[in-house]
Amino acid sequence: IIYRVVRLSEEKDMDEFQKGKLYLCATPIGNLEDMPVRAIRLMKEADVIAAEDTRNSIKLINHFQIDTPMTSYHEFNKYDKARALVDRMLKGETVALITDAGTPGISDPGEELVKQCVEADIEVISVPGPAACINALIISGLSTRRFCFEAFLPSDKKERNEVLNELAAETRTMIIYEAPHRLVKTLTELMNILGQDRKIAVCKELTKKHETVFRTVISEAVDYYLSLIHI
């Protein structure tokens, strides 16, 4: 009986040892000098790199002379592709996950892969580095003691209004992503629920040559970006 228990324990350990791992590798959000050294090494050692957009990531891969095969992993294939990647890790392969820019798993498809790895008892390891939301927060001049991250507001009108109504009572610093062509619309909506005098910092081109941070109140931000449209 003792032999059988030990034997089963050894087999279990062997199964655990044979599993691969998932590395969440942060990449630059604009400046290639911000690429984590550890991420470069792990991406080179991995069996495959799962990239949100292989066409975009190939520039990064080539710059750092990484020859690991890439596979696409994005919003429209995340469920099936996550299962396929989990199967590979269960067979002992190591996967490095990267996003278009910054830290994977934050408001991107990486969340689903992490979830499936956890369910399959596969080790998930973070390789820290740039993250646009945190970079914006720490240079904003707004309170960093308590904050919430909203990512992109919903595009569906009903869902968007529900979220905006929830934010109306939010007193913490809010981090919100927005595309340039929708900035004025979103700022106007926020002004209507938060008031004209709510402090704001609009951060653009973070870590790049033309990085800008516009610190003001919402009403002035709306007026300023409207004036740029009419130039």
Which functions belong to the PLM regions below?
Residues V5-V6, E10-D13:
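Acidic, Ala/Val/Gly-enriched low-complexity intrinsically disordered segments
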Residues D13-F76:
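Glycine-rich, flexible N-terminal cofactor/catalytic loop recognition
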Residues I29-L32, D100-P104, P180-R182:
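Short glycine-rich anion-binding loops that position phosphate/pyrophosphate groups of nucleotides
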Residues M43-I49, I122-I125, T173-M174:
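Short active-site oxyanion
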Residues L85-V124, P128-A131:
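Glycine/small-residue-rich loop that forms an oxyanion/phosphate-binding "nest" at active or ligand-binding sites
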Residues E112-E170:
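Class I SAM-dependent methyltransferase SAM-binding "motif I" and its flanking Rossmann-like core
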Residues R160-L164, T186-S227:
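Anionic-ligand binding region
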Residues I229-I231:
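Conserved small/polar residues in nucleotide/adenosyl-binding loops
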